[in-house]
Swiss-Prot record:
It comes from the Bacteria. It is found in: Fimbrium. InterPro entries: Adhesion_dom_fimbrial (IPR000259), Adhesion_dom_fimbrial_sf (IPR036937), Adhesion_dom_sf (IPR008966), Bact_Fimbrial_Adh_Pro (IPR050263), FimH_man-bd (IPR015243). This is Type 1 fimbrin D-mannose specific adhesin. Keywords: Fimbrium, Signal. One of its GO terms (cellular component) is host cell membrane. Involved in regulation of length and mediation of adhesion of type 1 fimbriae (but not necessary for the production of fimbriae). Adhesin responsible for the binding to D-mannose. It is laterally positioned at intervals in the structure of the type 1 fimbriae. In order to integrate FimH in the fimbriae FimF and FimG are needed.
Amino acid sequence: MKRVITLFAVLLMGWSVNAWSFACKTANGTAIPIGGGSANVYVNLAPVVNVGQNLVVDLSTQIFCHNDYPETITDYVTLQRGSAYGGVLSNFSGTVKYSGSSYPFPTTSETPRVVYNSRTDKPWPVALYLTPVSSAGGVAIKAGSLIAVLILRQTNNYNSDDFQFVWNIYANNDVVVPTGGCDVSARDVTVTLPDYPGSVPIPLTVYCAKSQNLGYYLSGTTADAGNSIFTNTASFSPAQGVGVQLTRNGTIIPANNTVSLGAVGTSAVSLGLTANYARTGGQVTAGNVQSIIGVTFVYQ
């Protein structure tokens, strides 16, 4: 009887190993073993401006899976479910590309199966995209923000195994995702004016994935009735009687006055801005000058 029990135990062990044949890991080595589970995936976000969608993250470079027994078992893998974008992206819809086909995101149904039949780690073919909205601005994402929760479902042709591999996708870096079809050369530009009464060009350009009419307007606290001289906000030894004024091709630009750039395409277009000193009234005294001026883009 003892020999029978031992033989049965060995046979049971062999059946368990061969039936559970699928496991996954992340690019940094975090694993979800045979039988499923959950893991966090920290991804570096590098958005780009594309026509119709802006890439948020390509998970095919981050998640890999394999089949331990391809001779006897074929594993089938789907994207069973994908959550809405988390945090600051929760109000935006998008798409998910799975094995070359695009689906709504958040997902509305399970995707078709992808076959895993090799011991070699194979990328999980998932990429998330954000659908543009009617703004040329962007959404700031902080490192550590939850981007999405994706559920990989694994079945096979051997038995009734049905396992879930849950991937919590987090941003690994601070980034601004452009939510429109256009983007700018820099989101924070600092220029240094020479001594009074000097001026300096502002190196700011904009480009779009496809040609569209674009404009912009300036915003900030102004010190004059014409809303064109921005207040000196220097906190240390500020100059008196002077502020900052922006011009375009020699023409003064008041705050909240839309400037048309015309058709903007894939080639960067300069905003043509120059920063200048401007008198606000009263006696001018020496000191520091600083102004913070916002630029907002609009589709026309």
